[in-house]
Regions:
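Long, highly charged low-complexity segments enriched in Glu/Asp and Lys/Arg with interspersed Ser/Thr
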Residues: 130-131, 137, 189-208
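Secondary-structure transition/capping motifs at alpha-helix termini
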Residues: 19-35
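Short acidic, low-complexity intrinsically disordered linear motifs used
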Residues: 168-183
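Cysteine-rich micro-motifs
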Residues: 153-164
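Single conserved hydrophobic/aromatic residue that forms the stacking wall/gate
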Residues: 1-6, 10-13
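Well-ordered, non-membrane alpha-helical segments in soluble/globular domains
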Residues: 11-24, 115-124
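Short functional micro-motifs and their immediate structural scaffolds
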Residues: 149-150, 166-168
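Catalytic alpha/beta core of large soluble enzyme barrels
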Residues: 36, 42-151, 173
Length: 208
């Protein structure tokens, strides 16, 4: 369910789970005198693997196993058409329990024309989150000199201007986990590619 009410319910449930995990983290730290922590993992393979295993066991469940991937960490559903502010408001309560590491990010179109929009998000996030990534398209085609956002499919990437998809003459950069990667030169696992395909921008393209 992708409704706002359902999101609130699931958020409360997942925060309850994290509080329980935090309790054991602290207990084990005191018991063994070794620091334990909760890491909001961007595990590349588990995005794909856990979904496949659950589909084999439980079948195809709408909005869960039918997507072909699981959402990383505490990130808001990448399919949701929300603003950067709404996304950060949803995620901001989770890092308190994730002392081992976390990241927030928002997806944008090219914003060369509107730097103040980015600054507004950064200002808003300043006292709400501890680590914020800004995903702006910087893909480049060396065949037609296009700069921007390549078309993303489950089979790869191509220049929207000339259709070029030759790995030797394109440069594509995507946030594949907590890091930036080039999925043309180093293809990602199938579930991750499906997740990238499902992403929506959290800010709209300007009207021409």
């Amino acid at each position: 369910d992708r409704s706002s009410a359902a999101s609130d319910v699931y958020k409360r449930q997942t925060l309850d789970i994290l509080r329980e995990m935090k309790y054991y983290q602290n207990a084990w730290t005191n018991q063994y005198d070794i620091w334990f922590s909760i890491y909001s993992t961007p595990s590349e393979s588990l995005t794909d693997r856990f979904c496949r295993l659950d589909k084999e066991r439980f079948g195809e469940i709408p909005d869960i196993t039918d997507k072909g991937y699981y959402q990383n960490s505490f990130h808001y559903d990448v399919r949701k058409d929300v603003t950067p502010f709404e996304k950060l408001d949803f995620e901001k309560d989770y890092p308190y329990y994730a002392s081992g590491g976390f990241i927030h990010y928002c997806e944008y179109p090219k914003l060369n024309h509107n730097i103040k929009a980015l600054e507004a998000v950064w200002d808003y996030s300043y006292d709400k989150v501890g680590y914020l990534g800004t995903n702006i398209p910087i893909d480049h085609c060396y065949k037609c000199d296009y700069d921007g956002d390549f078309e993303t499919t489950e089979n790869g990437y191509k220049c929207p201007n000339c259709g070029n998809s030759d790995p030797k003459t394109v440069d594509v950069v995507k946030r594949t986990c907590g890091y930036l990667g080039n999925p043309v030169q180093r293809p990602v696992i199938e579930g991750r590619q499906k997740e990238i395909c499902a992403r929506v921008k959290h800010m709209k393209e300007p009207r021409s």
